[in-house]
UniProtKB/Swiss-Prot annotation:
It comes from Cellulomonas fimi. It catalyses: Endohydrolysis of (1->4)-beta-D-glucosidic linkages in cellulose, lichenin and cereal beta-D-glucans. Gene3D superfamilies: 2.60.40.290, Glycosidases, Immunoglobulins. Pfam families: CBM_2, Cellulase, fn3. This is Endoglucanase D. One of its GO terms (biological process) is cellulose catabolic process. Pathway: Glycan metabolism; cellulose degradation.
């Protein structure tokens, strides 16, 4: 998986604490949930014409959405329902313009649902009283009624064969006791159960089939009927689904590698294949397109694409931009399908963290712009904050949105008309009846889509600056494409600093006595962006009094920690601006936790056996704040009152590499509040990346410390974490695991 064939070494983490409710097998009768009257009308079904998804009248339909995982995992229910409310989350998605949700499931779950056997769901019914007493299928179908209420559509994605938080790591659509025939059976059951409910509009046949020429098993794409030919499997599964429900869209992803001209699939040469992301290689469509016969008009191809924080692909290791990514990666792997009018595309997964690597931000902005410019459908990865290498649109509390990620990356790709987000339901506006942010596809005019950008704003002027702000005004743009001007983007140089629906904006956070250049662009309801206005330059005021920040605190040291506190000391700062140092700001990570006036402070309220990082800034009487000190890291002491522990360790390996899943269970009678799992590699293995915990390796010793969202394990509760690594031929499992210095039982 980390081979020279440019495979994506990510194991994009779908893992979470199981801790509010233990998973207990319940034998329960299958309980049907009646579909509302609107769901039976069938007027929201979609099909394709050329490279465009359209509704039953032939009107363009752009699927603009997000992924929400959990039903694919061991919990078998949406993650986050241990703290977030299902109704509020769903309504917020709709109000923010998300008109479709891709829901990962497993074949194992579909077969369990078919058999009427359920696990007790991991749901906090205090936060979700509406889910009291419901099994996982009933929760899913209750959520479908919420989607109907708020105008959201859904499609299912078989993410893995087994109900496993790391199940997507396995290369194929089968695994263990789950066979290819089982996958067909699961899809046929789903197509039958929801054939009359147009809330569910499609099926993503299998998530990210992958594997390289060095893999024991790998997914290929050719014209054979071989067991490992994903093209044949996807074609067969799609035909079985469409024989039951001919109205569903079927989404077919790519594989990982494709042979260069003249190279057979039997070759193991490292340079014999084109490689890209799991699910992102659709080169085979040119030679071996999916053939669905009479149902060809239900086919959508669905590649995945990620940035360098997921894996540092070779195209990120040189200077790149949207043009080079299009020419080198997107074009030959999948964009040709859209550009040559073969079929529509839906980018099934894309997204990631912002502000950690400029290359990551550049990649995401480039793909964002491609999606908006080509009017592509997409489902952003991901709503969940507990996706280890991408983060989510929601923060760890499952209530607060990452406004920067949403507004700068996802929102510009959402389908808009006349300044409102467009839903795929013909009766219900996106956001529900009375929505002020959304409209219905039935309210959007048919005919040729609006691809005309607004006029560039004119008359940009700067008002009177202060030492840190510049007010801007301009004349309104016009739009002849039919969707109307929806707002404006304000740029400082090439940096987007704000958006507004008005023709004025005040830029803040500027440095005193400094020159800045500003420009403005208009956007219309279809997402088209104008050329930039003529630029205007303004200089901020010089300011008065002390504008010099104190020196940076030095010598930050952590004393002996307890289970809940850490004492800190540092050397005093100096101030040459004249107002003098008045105090300090102490930060835990990026969170301000105290403002002492002296050069010491004890941080309290911490979790036991947990790693923390602290920094200090100095503040003077004029309000100037220094840069942060060098950080100091410290791990709190174990809590002697925590319970016992048990660990299950399983690894999947290949030549030179492996992935491991680790389940930590609190077997004690009191909650485990903050934990660090420790073990040693016995065979010289090397950790490369991990998820759902903060991983570190020193020599052979490895530690995994809880994330904020899985810090507390109730008695009997478990958390699933994992990592990938390399080995030199021997991959012996660790023999001993410890938490807080105590040895865990190994299962």
């Amino acid at each position: 998986m980390h081979s020279a064939s440019r495979t994506r070494a990510r194991t994009r983490v779908r893992t979470a604490v199981s801790g509010l409710l233990a998973a207990t097998v319940l034998a329960a009768p299958l309980t049907l949930v009646a579909a509302p009257a609107q769901a039976a009308t069938g007027d929201d079904w979609l099909h394709v014409e050329g490279n465009t998804i359209v509704d039953s009248t032939g009107k363009e339909a752009i699927l603009s959405g997000v992924n929400w995982f959990g039903f694919n995992a061991s919990e078998r229910v949406f993650h986050g329902l241990w703290s977030g409310n299902i109704t509020q989350i769903t309504q917020q998605m709709a109000q923010r313009g998300i008109n479709v949700v891709r829901v990962p499931v497993s074949t194992q779950l579909l077969l369990e649902w078919k058999a009427g056997t359920f696990l007790k769901p991991n749901v906090n019914t205090y936060a979700n009283p509406e889910l009291e007493g419901k099994n996982s299928l009933q929760i899913f179908e209750y959520w479908l009624t919420l989607c109907q209420k708020y105008g959201i559509k859904v499609f299912l994605d078989v993410h893995s064969a087994e109900a496993d938080n790391s199940g997507h790591v396995y290369n194929m659509w089968w695994k263990g006791d789950i066979t290819t025939e089982d996958v067909y059976e699961g899809w046929e059951w789903a197509a039958t159960r929801w054939k009359d409910d147009d809330t569910i509009v499609g099926a993503d046949i299998k998530n990210e089939p992958h594997g390289t020429q060095g893999s024991t098993e790998r997914a290929k794409w050719d014209g054979t009927t071989d067991k490992d030919n994903f093209k044949h499997f996807a074609e067969t599964a799609s035909k079985k689904i469409l024989a039951i429900n001919p109205n569903w869209l079927v989404f077919v992803e790519g594989v990982e590698i494709y042979p260069k001209p003249g190279v057979p699939w039997t070759s193991t040469g490292l340079t014999d294949y084109y490689g890209t992301w799991w699910g992102g290689n659709l080169r085979g469509v040119r030679d071996h397109p999916i053939d669905l016969g009479a149902h060809q008009d239900q086919l959508v191809y669905s590649p995945h694409d990620y940035g360098p924080l997921v894996f540092d692909q070779k195209w990120f290791q040189k200077d790149f931009d949207k043009a080079s990514l299009t020419a080198d990666v997107w074009g030959p792997n999948w964009l040709f399908i859209h550009d040559e009018d073969i079929a529509p595309l839906l980018i099934g997964e894309w997204g990631g963290r912002l502000g950690q690597d400029p290359r990551q931000d550049k990649w995401m902005a480039a793909l964002r712009d491609l999606v908006a410019e080509r009017r592509l459908s997409q489902t952003f990865w991901v709503l969940n904050p507990n996706s280890g290498d991408t983060g989510g649109l929601l923060l760890d509390d499952w209530k607060t949105w990452d406004e920067v990620k949403y507004s700068t990356m996802l929102e510009p790709t959402l389908w808009k008309h006349g300044g409102k987000y467009v839903g795929l339901d013909h009766q219900v506006p996106l956001g529900g009846v009375g929505s002020t942010t959304g409209t219905s596809i039935s309210q959007v005019g048919g005919g040729t889509p609006d691809t005309t950008a607004p006029t560039a704003p004119t008359g940009l002027r700067a008002g009177t600056p202060t030492a840190s702000t510049v007010p801007l005004t301009w004349s309104a743009s016009t739009d002849t494409g039919g969707s109307g001007v929806a707002g404006y983007e304000v740029y400082r140089g090439t940096t987007l600093v704000g958006t507004t629906t008005a023709t004025s904006y005040t830029v803040t956070g500027l440095a005193a006595d400094s020159a800045y250049t500003f420009s403005v662009r208009a956007k219309d309801g279809a997402g088209n962006t104008s050329a930039a206005s003529a630029a205007v330059t303004a200089r901020t005021a010089a300011g008065g009094g002390d504008v010099t920040a104190p020196s940076v605190p030095t010598g930050l040291t952590a004393g002996t920690p307890t289970a809940t506190s850490v004492p800190l000391t540092w050397t005093a700062s100096t101030d040459t601006g004249g107002s003098g140092v008045t105090g300090y700001e102490v930060y835990r990570g990026s969170t301000l936790v105290a403002r002492p006036t002296g050069t010491s402070h004890t941080v309290t309220g911490l979790s036991a056996a947990t790693a923390y990082t602290f920094t200090v800034r100095a503040v003077d009487a004029a309000g100037n704040v220094s840069a942060a000190s060098a950080p100091v890291g410290v791990t709190t002491a174990p809590d002697p009152t925590t319970g016992s522990c048990a660990v299950t360790y399983t690894a999947n390996g290949w030549s030179g590499g492996f992935t491991a899943a680790v389940t930590l269970t609190n077997t004690g009678t009191t909650a485990l509040s903050g934990w660090t799992l420790g073990f040693a590699f016995p065979s010289g293995q090397t950790l490369t990346q991990g998820w759902s915990a903060r991983w570190a390796q020193s020599g052979s010793s490895v530690t995994a410390t809880n994330e904020a969202w899985n810090a507390v394990l109730a008695p009997g509760a478990s958390v699933e974490i994992g990592f990938s690594g390399t080995h030199t031929g021997t991959n012996t499992a660790p023999a001993t695991f410890t938490v807080g210095g105590a040895t865990c039982t190994t299962r």
